[in-house]
A protein has these predicted regions:
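Short acidic, glycine/proline-rich loop/turn micro-motifs
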Residues: 28, 86-89, 135-138
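Short, charged/polar low-complexity linear motifs in solvent-exposed/disordered segments
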Residues: 30-31, 77-79, 135-136
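Short, glycine/proline-biased beta-turn/loop segments that scaffold the active-site neighborhood
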Residues: 1-44, 118-131
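Active-site-adjacent helix/loop patches that line small-molecule binding or acyl-intermediate pockets
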Residues: 16-21, 34-112, 157-158
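A penicillin-recognizing enzyme superfamily signal
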Residues: 11-12, 49, 53, 99-105, ...
Length: 170
């Protein structure tokens, strides 16, 4: 969702009020995500802070400005093959099945300036004498702009350096 936001003109520095947001789901019913984060309630926080702190309210705010169908489309563009993804407002919190390989492949777009590199398990085949019988190159596809990729790198670093991912540094 944050990548979709960056692709649609949002910036990591954009400020959002840290309050509960209620969206209308695909059945016309109100949907309000719960939030474990009790910091800065009512204050203005940045989009980057929202991702760094895994904040469901900021995520819901972004979904209110975007579209679950566009999010589903972007998820597939990033190489996720699951066709059972439901384009609902709750998709912003990530309730869909994605394999580790798909996740790794999707995340390659950020350090590669928006180009996703598909997993490649065999790079070449040789015979017993070392002669190369076949070579294989990874499939690459531009999935987001260079600008969005850079903004996502900034925000993902904040997850580890300032937010909920800090445990991986210890």
């Amino acid at each position: 969702l944050y990548t979709l936001a960056m692709e649609n003109g949002f910036s990591p520095c954009d400020e959002v009020r840290h309050v509960e947001y209620t969206l209308i789901d695909e059945n016309g019913k109100p949907w309000t995500p719960r939030n474990a984060n009790k910091k800065l309630i009512g204050d203005m926080v940045t989009v980057k802070w929202g991702l760094a702190n895994s904040d469901n309210w900021i995520t819901a705010y972004l979904m209110s400005k975007l579209n679950p169908y566009n999010l589903k489309r972007l998820i597939h563009t990033f190489g996720v093959r699951n066709r059972d993804i439901v384009p609902s407002v709750s998709l912003c919190l990530g309730p869909c099945e994605i394999s580790v390989g798909e996740m790794v492949s999707a995340y390659t777009a950020f350090p590669n300036k928006g180009i996703r590199v598909a997993p490649l398990f065999v790079t070449r085949i040789e015979d017993n004498d070392g002669n190369v019988l076949a070579t294989f190159a990874p499939e690459m596809q531009e999935v987001i702009s260079v600008s969005s990729a850079y903004k996502m790198l900034v925000m993902l670093r904040a997850v580890v350096n300032e937010g909920t991912g800090g445990r991986v540094r210890r």
